[in-house]
Each structure stands twice: as C-alpha cells, then as structure tokens.
Design a protein with these regions (language model features):
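Phosphate-binding chemistry for phosphorylated carbohydrates and sugar-nucleotides
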Residues: 1-145, 158
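Catalytic-core signal marking the mid-to-C-terminal active-site face
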Residues: 144-204
Length: 204
C-alpha cells in the first residue's frame, strides 16, 4: 500500500506538519494522484467541496464560469449548495463518479466540476481529476487574492454529514420499498430546507 497511513485518506500527519512548520498550505494525494485534498494554515482539511467553492467563486469573479455552473455529485455537502446560492452560482448534481461529472461537463460546456473526495476536473486542461493541477489552481487563487487558504473558505459552512452503509439483499428493491420511501419522505418533510437525506445504491 503506497499510501499506508498517508495521502488523502490519512491526512492527519500533513495537518500536524503544516501547523508545526507554519506553512501556508499542504496538499495530499491518493495513490495515482487524481484526487487532491488540502490543509489550510490552521490545519483544517479542505475537501473537494471547499475546492469547488473556492475556484467556482474565483471563476465567476473573472467572468470565466461558463454557464455560471459548477458540476457536483449528489454526495456534495448541503452547505455547498447554500453557499453557491448566496454567491449566485448555479450548480448541477450528477451520480457519484468523476466520469459522470465529466460527461455532464462535456455535454453542457462547463469548466469546473468534481467530487467531495477531491476528484476535481478542470475541463480546459483535462477530462479527469489531476491532483497536481488542483494544487496549482488553489495556489493561483491564493496568490491572485493575496489571501490565506482559510480566508478563501469563509463563505462556506459545511453542514454536519453522516454516511451510513446498510446491507440489504436487493439494493434496487430496498429503495422501492414503500416503508423506505415513507421514511425518507418523513425525514425530508421534517428537515425542510435546513438539510437533506440521500438514499442511493452503492456502486460496490
């Protein structure tokens, strides 16, 4: 395992290093470096949702956010959509998987999209995630705005998010079950516009 206790899935060591050394930012990649997460100067983890917010706002300010749209997946945090609404930025939601993100981008002429996990696609340069490119783009924004990474995320509040995996015999049948549908509807009504519930089949 080339990323044993390291990389984007074990970012604790990077958080500690950034704070101890007084660094401006840190970047963590997965094994093939198509995913990138960041650590700000305070040691906070900057997820793919943060990155989409930062660069989406940056592109909008410069009139380069084609179709005024950032492409996300259904797994993005509810707070990201609230922040986009406040900034007047449109968004699209695709199924989970960077291939679905890129398919939407290609069909609709969008320039930026990605996943919470750190797969970020800049379609002007690539058709898939590129961790090194994502790092460069984040530093570009920091330099252009003369701002710390933590300042770039101030307009984004990440809502509490809980992921639960439930084993079932038949994934499709479980989602179509009347009791499951009723339970989901009840939660949606209780949350209103303050949160959301997502029930989906796992791809594995």
């Amino acid at each position: 395992n080339i990323n044993n206790n390291a990389g984007s899935t074990h970012i604790e060591g990077l958080q500690k290093l950034v704070v101890e050394k007084g660094l401006d930012v840190g970047f963590a990649y997965d094994g093939d470096a198509d995913r990138c997460l960041c650590v700000d100067e305070k040691g906070n983890v900057i997820t793919g949702d943060h990155i989409l917010y930062i660069y989406g706002c940056y592109m909008k300010e410069r009139g380069k956010l084609l179709n005024n749209t950032v492409v996300t997946t259904v797994m993005s945090n509810f707070g990201l959509y609230k922040a986009f609404d406040e900034q007047g930025i449109g968004y699209a939601k695709t199924a989970v998987g960077d291939k679905y993100v890129y398919e939407y981008m290609a069909k609709n002429g969008c320039r930026i999209g990605g996943e919470q996990s750190g797969h970020i696609i800049f379609s002007k340069y690539a058709s898939t995630g590129d961790g090194i490119l994502t790092s460069l783009k984040m530093m570009e924004v920091m330099m252009a705005r003369k701002a710390k990474m933590s300042q770039l995320t101030e307009g984004l509040t990440i809502y509490p998010q809980v992921l639960e995996n439930v084993r079932v015999v038949d994934k499709t049948a479980a989602q179509e079950d009347p009791d499951v549908k009723a339970a989901v509807k009840a939660v949606e009504e209780a949350l209103g516009d303050t949160g959301r519930i997502l029930v989906r089949e796992s791809g594995t």
